[in-house]
Amino acid sequence: MAQKKGGGSTRNGRDSQPKMLGVKKFGGEVINAGSIIVRQRGTKFHPGVNVGIGKDHTLFALVDGAVSFSVKGALNKHTVNVTPA
């Protein structure tokens, strides 16, 4: 007979796929229209001039140009802008 009991099942053993969030293009970088600048959950970064926002809060460039980040107001609102090249 076996000297050990059979191993029971476990409730662990699963994990979600990585979502690849974060800043994709940094301040001063030159980008093309449609390029993703920030992938995020919620609006940690808000769209500014020449920046659009997707339904999953992804920020993307509306024109070709250079990326710039700014912090404004008493609430330290982070805004992303694209200056046309």
UniProtKB/Swiss-Prot annotation:
GO terms for cellular component: cytosolic large ribosomal subunit. It comes from Polaromonas sp. (strain JS666 / ATCC BAA-500). The keyword Magnesium does not apply. It comes from the Bacteria. Pfam families: Ribosomal_L27. Keywords: Ribonucleoprotein, Ribosomal protein. Residues 1-10 have a biased composition (Gly residues). GO terms for biological process: translation. This is Large ribosomal subunit protein bL27. Belongs to the bacterial ribosomal protein bL27 family. SUPFAM superfamilies: Ribosomal L27 protein-like. Gene3D superfamilies: 2.40.50.100.
